Amino acid sequence: YAGTGKTFIMLYLALNAILNRTVPQEKILIVRSMLPIRDIGFLPGNTEEKTSVYTEPYNALFEELFPGIPNPYDLAKYSDILDFMPTSYMRGITVRDSLVIVDECQNLNFHELDTIMTRVGQNSKIYFCGDFLQTDLRNPQEQNGIIKFMEILHDMKSFRTIAFKEHDIVRSGLLKEYIISKNKKEYAMNFDSIDKKLRSKIA
């Protein structure tokens, strides 16, 4: 659900592990789709300039995690403990010695999810954060990609699933009330079959 702190929790745990050297990995890699413009090659500027609008949420999260430290997100990048990469740039690389956070994974089709998984190299761990109820994908075939992907992961001993519920919403009381009300109405019905499939895998 929206507002449960999925990305915040994942970043906190990853940063705590990297900074305190409690894991063998050396850095954090955040991966995110550039949807609705997956192919960002036509945008002006270098990679940093093209992706800046999508890294802004992480700037805010780092400021919350490190109050009083100027530009903590940029500092982490310059210290080489953090990197950001759009899915468009994943093909052909091998990600080693990293904690990989795939954020907003509900906006990835199966091809993108599959590509990311095949990039994971030695001494790396990968985490997927997302909420299929917030997907920006409109093509039903693309929406079903995450179902197929989770069915594959469900059969792997290396993976575990953590599901957040309505009572886990912490962004605001208003949002929590809204989500609970929305889930009772027709607006959630389009996702009912997806919900049942995913929860059957989690159960």
Question: Language-model features: where?
Answer:
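Conserved P-loop
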Residues: 1-77, 137-155
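Conserved nucleotide-binding/hydrolysis micro-motifs of P-loop NTPases
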Residues: 3-4, 33-38, 89-91, 106-107, ...
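Conserved catalytic network of the ASCE P-loop NTPase/AAA+ motor domain
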Residues: 20-23, 91-94, 108, 118-127, ...
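Loop/turn-to-beta-strand initiation segments
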Residues: 26-27, 79-82, 96-99, 122-128
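Conserved GTP-binding G-domain of TRAFAC-class P-loop NTPases and closely related GTPase folds
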Residues: 47-65, 83, 166-186
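Conserved catalytic/switch belt of AAA+ P-loop NTPases
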Residues: 59-60, 67, 114-127, 131
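Conserved RecA-like ASCE ATPase "motif II neighborhood" in helicase/translocase motors
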Residues: 78-115
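Conserved coupling/interface region of RecA-like P-loop/ASCE motor cores
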Residues: 149-198
